[in-house]
């Protein structure tokens, strides 16, 4: 029978079927294919069912609350306690075992890194430091060969306003030439903040740090912000001189009226100079202001450059020579009354009375003689 023949060869669907029995062969082939399909479908269904079960478990875990952090010190000692509100009450808070020491060291390193990132961000905003790409080894070798003839890169003999570029990042500090001193000394190789193995993106400018420790090229402006070292009396002179110019008086007359009590000049100009030298900083003669320095922008135009502390005449001597004869003893009174902090009109009245007091002694005698006659 063709059906028996078909059942006897269920696993030969590739062979040429017999002529009389193509439909039964097709049935058998279809049955075997159906069996294979059911078995394959079962396998695929099992795998898909397993996958759907796994996905269902992951979805259920996602629906749960997020994992709470556990205390690392308690975990080192075999306990699992949530970290929230547990820091003060941890039993192993002061533990000095090997694992807990490792945790403390890691915390210190992370805190230092956070502080370093914050400081670098602040310096980048202020423009103090800027990113510098680190050169390769071949470029460093070429730079060292080029700079071999000139060992002193930045000396005090250079008078340009813009400083020369800093030395390469990995080069050692060079030796100074005999005619000038080095401005950059003992600057770290890559950066001033460590992390040699992982070089940071921001490398601080070497001239920024050298300006703190080394003297500048111009000795008069020897501090960081280039403020000239004026004494208090000259600052008071400049402010009162501006007021005097607004009122219409000369700067020399009005500058002495607004001075506070410690700076009122005495009988001679020597005391004025002594008080000036006491109040200003201990600056040697090379820091003295000369006439070729430009006046600072925040001072008024009434401050003359000709009058220096040591060279020029004092203001009290100039006023005494103008307002009274040099032989009279009223020069101290005139200078003191002119420097008193009162209004312009009353000062002028006092000066007129004092200047007129001396010649008024001459015309008194004829009046008395006429009355006696």
Swiss-Prot record:
Gene this chain is encoded by: DMRT1
Compartments reported by the entry: Nucleus
Name used for this protein in its record: Doublesex- and mab-3-related transcription factor 1
Classification via Pfam families: DM, Dmrt1
PANTHER family recorded: DOUBLESEX AND MAB-3 RELATED TRANSCRIPTION FACTOR DMRT, DOUBLESEX- AND MAB-3-RELATED TRANSCRIPTION FACTOR 1
The keyword Transcription regulation belongs to this UniProt entry's keyword annotation: yes
UniProt xrefs under SMART domains: DM (SM00301)
Family: Belongs to the DMRT family.
UniProt cross-references to SUPFAM superfamilies, sorted A to Z: Cysteine-rich DNA binding domain, (DM domain)
GO biological process assignments: male germ cell proliferation; male sex determination; male sex differentiation; negative regulation of meiotic nuclear division; negative regulation of transcription by RNA polymerase II; positive regulation of mitotic nuclear division; positive regulation of transcription by RNA polymerase II; regulation of transcription by RNA polymerase II
Composition bias, Low complexity: 8-18, 327-346
Xref: InterPro entries: DM_DNA-bd, DM_DNA-bd_sf, DMRT, DMRT1-like
């Amino acid at each position: 029978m063709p059906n028996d023949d078909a059942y006897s060869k269920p696993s030969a669907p590739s062979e040429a079927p017999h002529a009389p029995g193509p439909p039964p062969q097709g049935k058998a082939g279809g049955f075997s294919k159906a069996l294979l399909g059911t078995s394959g479908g079962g396998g695929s269904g099992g795998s898909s069912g397993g996958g759907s079960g796994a996905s269902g478990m992951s979805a259920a875990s996602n629906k749960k609350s997020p994992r709470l952090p556990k205390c690392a010190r308690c975990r080192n000692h075999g306990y699992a306690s949530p970290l929230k509100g547990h820091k003060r009450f941890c039993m192993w808070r002061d533990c000095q075992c090997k694992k807990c020491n490792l945790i403390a060291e890691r915390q210190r390193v992370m805190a230092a890194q956070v502080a370093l990132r914050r400081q670098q961000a602040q310096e980048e905003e202020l423009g103090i430091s800027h990113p510098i790409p680190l050169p390769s080894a071949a470029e460093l070798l070429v730079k060292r060969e080029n700079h071999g003839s000139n060992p002193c890169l930045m000396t005090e003999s250079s008078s340009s306003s813009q400083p020369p570029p800093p030395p390469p990042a990995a080069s050692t500090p060079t030796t100074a030439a005999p005619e000038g001193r080095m401005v950059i000394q003992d600057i770290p190789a890559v950066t001033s903040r460590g992390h040699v193995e992982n070089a940071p993106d921001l490398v601080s400018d070497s001239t920024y740090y050298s300006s703190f420790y080394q003297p500048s090229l111009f000795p008069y402006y020897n501090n960081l912000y280039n403020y000239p070292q004026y004494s208090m009396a000259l600052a008071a002179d400049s402010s009162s001189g501006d007021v005097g110019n607004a009122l219409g008086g000369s700067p020399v007359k009005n500058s002495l009226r607004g001075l506070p009590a410690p700076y009122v000049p005495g009988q001679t100009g020597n005391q004025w100079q002594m008080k000036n030298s006491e109040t200003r900083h201990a600056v040697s003669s090379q820091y003295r202001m000369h006439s070729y320095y430009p006046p600072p922008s925040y001072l008024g135009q009434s401050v003359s450059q000709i009058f220096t502390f040591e060279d020029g005449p004092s203001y009290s001597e100039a006023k005494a020579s103008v307002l009274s004869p040099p032989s009279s003893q009223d020069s101290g009174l005139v200078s003191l009354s002119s420097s008193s902090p009162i209004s312009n009109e009353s000062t002028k009245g006092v000066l007129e009375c004092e200047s007129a007091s001396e010649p008024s002694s001459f015309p008194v005698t004829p009046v008395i003689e006429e009355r006696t006659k």
